[in-house]
């Protein structure tokens, strides 16, 4: 009984120490996250010359990116697995 109480107490102390140590790193996390989100947003404005997975397409026009093919049945780009 005493051993399990000491083990639980040691676990709580370890959890507190790890949480306190990572707290300083977490203060910078929101700024880094926002900068990454806005950096990704800049790339959304650029259009590709081809259509990716799930984009609508017209069969026979070769609009899909490499390794994708336009499905005649569903009319969207899907992964081309060969014949």
Swiss-Prot record:
<keyword id="KW-0800">Toxin</keyword>
<keyword id="KW-0964">Secreted</keyword>
<comment type="subunit">
    <text>Monomer.</text>
</comment>
<keyword id="KW-0732">Signal</keyword>
<feature type="signal peptide">
    <location>
        <begin position="1"/>
        <end position="21"/>
    </location>
</feature>
<dbReference type="InterPro" id="IPR011696">
    <property type="entry name" value="Huwentoxin-1"/>
</dbReference>
<keyword id="KW-0960">Knottin</keyword>
<protein>
    <recommendedName>
        <fullName>Mu-theraphotoxin-Hhn2p</fullName>
    </recommendedName>
</protein>
<keyword id="KW-0027">Amidation</keyword>
<feature type="propeptide">
    <location>
        <begin position="22"/>
        <end position="48"/>
    </location>
</feature>
<dbReference type="GO" id="GO:0008200">
    <property type="term" value="F:ion channel inhibitor activity"/>
</dbReference>
<keyword id="KW-0738">Voltage-gated sodium channel impairing toxin</keyword>
<dbReference type="Pfam" id="PF07740">
    <property type="entry name" value="Toxin_12"/>
</dbReference>
<feature type="disulfide bond">
    <location>
        <begin position="64"/>
        <end position="77"/>
    </location>
</feature>
<dbReference type="GO" id="GO:0017080">
    <property type="term" value="F:sodium channel regulator activity"/>
</dbReference>
<feature type="modified residue" description="Leucine amide">
    <location>
        <position position="81"/>
    </location>
</feature>
<dbReference type="GO" id="GO:0044231">
    <property type="term" value="C:host cell presynaptic membrane"/>
</dbReference>
<dbReference type="GO" id="GO:0090729">
    <property type="term" value="F:toxin activity"/>
</dbReference>
<feature type="disulfide bond">
    <location>
        <begin position="57"/>
        <end position="70"/>
    </location>
</feature>
<keyword id="KW-1015">Disulfide bond</keyword>
<dbReference type="GO" id="GO:0005576">
    <property type="term" value="C:extracellular region"/>
</dbReference>
<comment type="similarity">
    <text>Belongs to the neurotoxin 10 (Hwtx-1) family. 15 (Hntx-3) subfamily.</text>
</comment>
<keyword id="KW-0872">Ion channel impairing toxin</keyword>
<comment type="function">
    <text>Lethal neurotoxin. Selectively blocks tetrodotoxin-sensitive voltage-gated sodium channels (Nav). Does not affect tetrodotoxin-resistant voltage-gated sodium channels or calcium channels.</text>
</comment>
<dbReference type="InterPro" id="IPR013140">
    <property type="entry name" value="Huwentoxin_CS1"/>
</dbReference>
<keyword id="KW-0638">Presynaptic neurotoxin</keyword>
<feature type="disulfide bond">
    <location>
        <begin position="50"/>
        <end position="65"/>
    </location>
</feature>
<keyword id="KW-0528">Neurotoxin</keyword>
């Amino acid at each position: 009984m005493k051993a399990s109480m000491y083990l639980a107490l040691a676990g709580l102390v370890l959890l507190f120490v790890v949480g306190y140590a990572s707290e300083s790193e977490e203060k910078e996390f929101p700024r880094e996250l926002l900068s990454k989100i806005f950096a990704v947003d800049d790339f959304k404005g650029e259009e590709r010359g081809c259509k990716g997975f799930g984009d609508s397409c017209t069969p026979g026009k070769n609009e899909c990116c490499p390794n994708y093919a336009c499905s005649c049945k569903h009319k969207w780009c899907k992964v081309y697995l060969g014949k």
